[in-house]
Amino acid sequence: MAVENNTQRSYSIIPCFIFVELVIMAGTVLLAYYFECTDTFQVHIQGFFCQDGDLMKPYPGTEEESFISPLVLYCVLAATPTAIIFIGEISMYFIKSTRESLIAEEKMILTGDCCYLSPLLRRIIRFIGVFAFGLFATDIFVNAGQVVTGHLTPYFLTVCQPNYTSTDCRAHQQFINNGNICTGDLEVIEKARRSFPSKHAALSIYSALYATMYITSTIKTKSSRLAKPVLCLGTLCTAFLTGLNRVSEYRNHCSDVIAGFILGTAVALFLGMCVVHNFRGTQGSPSKPKPEDPRGVPLMAFPRIESPLETLSAQNHSASMTEVT
């Protein structure tokens, strides 16, 4: 029910946000927590070939010793798109040239008789909320893939230290079905079984692509043609280098990084195009044109074609009038 031209009354937006959106978000965060911080989901024990050179790379150390540690990665992934969206929305709202189009796309929502939700607040919550949901969803997909496949890292045999004396491992092509012959540190071995897909690659490309889609869809720069491309390509390049770092440190295979890039790209494209609709506002339904009165419009109209008989008759009539005069 419309109250004014730019105000719309809604009694369902707040209950839907509390009892649907927040519940789904809480369930997603909880599932990501169980994957990340508990042993609820056991990793598949995968076998390996004896003396496999692809699994005997040097141990690069713990994840905290990596050039891009998990703490730094998660902070940058969460903060960068959030800051871009927050600054971008506030800037567009207070700039006169973009504020008019923003207000035209988003209506002021009146909930009940007292509470107003401005277009600025709705857009910030929508875009950042969808980004956070996608970030946790990508983490769930990655952990599920690692648990199901149990793909071994390039340094697996280095930390596994398998007991070959208890197996028939005379040939290099001998496959060991029993993956429980490792004698190394169990915690390190557990992490060495979680290689596919690469979590760093999936999360970094998701965050970078989501931010890039927001920049290209909402931010308008008439004075500079290269500002947006440089910012977007720089963001995507950072994600690409993050994946390459995983390969250079022997923490993931090339196939793991590629799969992570594909996964993160798919999630970002789906949310950006199908959920937030390329970061466009929810425009009101355009007013339908008033239908014409059917009584004043003919059912079918044809172009008038002059008959040859009428032409000949007119000529004869003209000739007869000439003779009379």
Swiss-Prot record:
It comes from the Eukaryota. It is found in: Cell membrane; Cell projection, Neuron projection. The modification Phosphoserine is found at residue 307. The keyword Phosphoprotein applies. It is a multi-pass membrane protein. This is Phospholipid phosphatase-related protein type 1. Keywords: Cell membrane, Cell projection, Glycoprotein, Membrane, Phosphoprotein, Transmembrane, Transmembrane helix. Glycans are attached at residues 5, 163, 316. The chain crosses the membrane at residues 13-33, 67-87, 127-147, 201-218, 230-247, 257-277. GO terms for biological process: nervous system development; phospholipid metabolic process. Belongs to the PA-phosphatase related phosphoesterase family.
